[in-house]
């Protein structure tokens, strides 16, 4: 009888500890996919990023007195401005948006990316 109780309690404990399967995986914190763009139902990239990944728009680390710095925006690999440039990019054209931290952005695009970079890839 005692073994049956221990077995039952163990079975319940295992079931409680088991991971729950979810219908959708957690989103990648550095990427906004086309599916997320469509699901959000937002018209411009700035509002989309503000809703789905607001941390991308926040300033990080120290800046100098002469150059405050801002995240840089690249559209299909071409620098188009700072985060305000996202307001002019319509989500209907977006395939994905990726955030690069300062180190990765500087490695890929060079100096001037101390606040990171937002890469917008359009649908072809």
What do the PLM-derived regions correspond to, one by one?
Residues 1-7:
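Bacterial N-terminal signal peptides that target proteins for export
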Residues 65-103:
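Periplasmic plug
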Residues 27, 52, 66-70, 92-95, ...:
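Extracytoplasmic
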Residues 11-32:
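Bacterial Sec signal peptide processing site at the extreme N-terminus
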Residues 36-64:
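Post-signal-peptide N-terminal segment of Sec-exported extracytoplasmic proteins
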Residues 28-46, 74-78, 83-84, 122:
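Short, polar/charged loop or turn motifs at beta-strand boundaries
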Residues 94-124:
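A beta-strand signature from Gram-negative outer-membrane beta-barrel systems
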Residues 42-50, 83, 91-94, 117:
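Extracytoplasmic/secreted envelope proteins and their assembly/folding machinery
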């Amino acid at each position: 009888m005692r073994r049956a109780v221990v077995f039952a309690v163990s079975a319940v404990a295992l079931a409680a500890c088991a991971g729950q399967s979810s219908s959708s995986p957690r989103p990648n914190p550095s990427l906004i996919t086309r599916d997320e763009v469509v699901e959000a139902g937002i018209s411009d990239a700035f509002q989309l990023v503000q809703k789905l990944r607001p941390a991308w728009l926040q300033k990080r680390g120290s800046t100098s007195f002469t150059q405050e710095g801002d995240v840089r925006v690249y559209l299909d690999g071409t620098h188009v401005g700072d985060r305000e440039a996202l307001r002019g990019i319509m989500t209907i054209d977006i395939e994905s948006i990726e955030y690069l931290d300062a180190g990765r952005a500087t490695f890929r695009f060079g100096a001037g990316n101390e606040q990171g970079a937002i890469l917008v890839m359009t649908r072809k």
